[in-house]
Structures are given as structure tokens and as C-alpha cells.
UniProtKB/Swiss-Prot annotation:
Belongs to the cortexillin family. Homodimer; parallel. It is found in: Cytoplasm, Cytoskeleton. Residues 8-115, 124-229 form the Calponin-homology (CH) domain. The lineage of its organism: Eukaryota, Amoebozoa, Evosea, Eumycetozoa, Dictyostelia. The keyword Repeat applies. This is Cortexillin-1. GO terms for cellular component: cytoplasm; cytoskeleton. SUPFAM superfamilies: Calponin-homology domain, CH-domain, Coiled-coil dimerization domain from cortexillin I. Residues 227-355, 403-436 form a coiled coil. The gene is ctxA.
Amino acid sequence: MAGKDWEIVQEKAFTAWVNSVLDKRGEKISDVAKDLSDGVKLIFFLELISGKKFNKKFDYEPKARINMIQNLALALHFLEDELKIKVQGIGAEDFVDNNKKMILGFLWTLYRKYRIAVISEGDKSSEEGLLLWCKNTTTGYNGVNVTSFTKTFRDGLAYLALAHKFDQSQFNFADYEKLDPIARLNAAFEYAEKGLGVPKLLEAEEVMRGTTDERSLVLYTSLFFHAYRAKEEKERLEASKSDLASKLAGLQNSLESEKLSREQLIKQKDELKSLLASLEGEAAEREKFLRELEAKLEEILKNLELERLARMELESRLSKMEKDKAILELKLAEAQDEKARLEAQIEADRIRSAAEAQSLGLLRKHLDQHVQDLIKWQKLSIENSSSTFDDQIIEEVSGLPFGEQVKHLATKLEDENKAIQKLLLSKEDDLKTAKKKAGK
């Protein structure tokens, strides 16, 4: 492939790619060499493919060359500092001067990073991953055996199989197996453009002859990979959209049902409010009743506790009283015994006193008689002529108590008896002596 042809292939491919990205911001280009020269759309493009915000201030409508160069310099610094992509041999002036070769090389570097390096199949990535993806996607198609970019795609069967696998309703693959390679390649490019949206970048004759360089083949084939991925993403979005539509339909039905029952709900709401107010009133009354009941229970428990303590105190006092009663009963029994003993003693003393009184009376009588006898004897006695006996006795006992008087009189009587006995004995002796003398 001549250098001019390669530029055409790249220009078509990169224009389509850049426009697919810029479309998200409502922008587009028609000439990659001219439309990126002021740096504005290049900055937008770099933001979109990287997902990073361009934070530097730049001129959105540069008129002078210096302003364009400043924008482009900021874009290249963003590419190197933020996106960590080093691009050799190109400067801001190359964009301003519309250096197509340098610009295409720049875009190829970006394309490899963001469109080829991201391809992954099995344990392979980049170009090898793309080749393995082609092999796996075309498995089962007659005559297709993907081994390399430079040899596999020359007969057109591989591209035709990729186009057919994407949408089998477009054509019958078997109808093209017997056609010549150029016819198959042209058919594949046509179906790829119609069915996959892959622009016709290659010439069938050059591909069949093997003069198309490998980079062009890689670039064109990568468009198939991304078309498949876009289809898968679209199917996922459609599934999500369908699911969302179902949910929206369900929500709409729910809203309609809710709309129909709105008045009923309002009525129920009012009824519930009334019921809630009633329940709140009942709850307040019930709470008040429970508080009063709790207070009464506390009072009852307090009274029961007081009664229990009083009962315990009463039981303690009764126990003490029973002990005191037993002691008193014992003391009473002892007192009664003592009383009986004293009464018996008093009775005995009374009887004894009566007997003693009677005896004393008799004794007094005997004493009086005896005193009379003594007096008589005294009168007879010669020794006692100086004073009378009774006056002496009366004088001696007049100041003494009765008992002492008795003792004193008894003593006197005993002394007198002894004196009388002695006197009688003396008289008897005298009488005996006189009798003896008279007998002589």
C-alpha cells in the first residue's frame, strides 16, 4: 500500500472515530488535519476518551496563531501529565500548520491506547487479543482459519464471516464461498458498512494482493471488534430499556390505580386520623388509669408492708408478753405458795399466840398466887423483915416489856424457889434436930 493510500485509510478511520467520540458533546470534524488546529476540539476529544476533566483555562474561540498554539500546548501537556501518554516528534505548531502525517501518527498513538490496547480475549490483549477474538468469533465457518493479519484476510472469507456472524439475516455465507476473493472482500466491506457501521477503508484488490500494510488491517479489523462490543452494549441498553419500560408501565398502572383510589385513600386517611385521635385519647385515658392503678398498688403495697411490720412487731410483743406472762404466772404461783405459807405461819402463830396468851394468863395467875405465897412465906421469914417483897417486884418489872417482865418474874421465882427450898431444908434440919433433942 502506498503512503498516500495509507493516509486515506487512516484519515477515514480516525475521522469516524473522533466524530463518534465528539458526538457526545454535539461536535464533529470533517478534516482531521484542519479541524483540530485550534486545539479546542482536541481538548474536548481528550477529555471524552480519558474520562478526565481538563482543568486548565483555555481560549474557546482562538483567532490568532499564538492563541491556537497555547491551546494545543495545554492539550499536549494534559496528554503527558494527566494521561501519562508521551507522543514523540509532534508539537503544537504541527497542528496549526496542518501537518497531516504528524497528526495521523498522533491519532494512531491514541487509537492504539484507547481502541486496540483495551482489546482482550483470553490471555491475549492488543493486536494478539484482536487476532484471537477474530479466530474465536469465526470458529465453525468453512475455509476460515485466522492466524495472522497479513495472510488470513486476503481471501475475504474472514471478513465475510465476521459480517455474517454479526447479523446472519443479511446474507447466506455459503452463497459466497465459491466466489473469487475480490468479490468476497467487496461483499464483506459492503455488509460491514451496512450492518456494522464499519466504513470501507480498504481496497479489495490491495488486500487480496497482500499490499495493504498490517497497521491498516489492524485498524480496520479493530472496527469490527468495537462494532460487536457496541452491539452488545446496545443489547444491554435495550434490555435495560425494556426492563425500565416494564417498570414504568407497572408504575403507570400503579399511578392510575392510585389515582382511581385517591378519594378512597383520602377518606381512609381521614378515618385513620379520626381513629388515631380516638386511639390516642384512649391511650391517654388508659395511661392515666394505669398511673392511678400503679399509685394505688404502691399504696396497697406500702400498707401491706406497714401491716407486715406491725404484725411482726405485734408477734414480737406477744412473744414477749407470753414470756412475761409465764414469768408472772411463775411468780404468782410462788407468791401464792408464799401466801399460803405465810397464812399457815400466821395461823400457827395465832394459835401459838392464843395458847401462849392462855398459858401466860395461867402463868400470871400462878405467879400471882405464887407471889402471894411468897409474900406469905416472906412474912414468915425472919431474914426478910426490912421491906415488902411485892413492892420490890413491882418496882423491878414496872419499866420492862411484858415478855421481859415474865422472864424477870420467872428468874425471881426460881431464885425464890431456891431460897424457899433452902429455907425448908433448913427448917427440916432444925426440926430434925429439935426432935432429936426432944427424944433424948
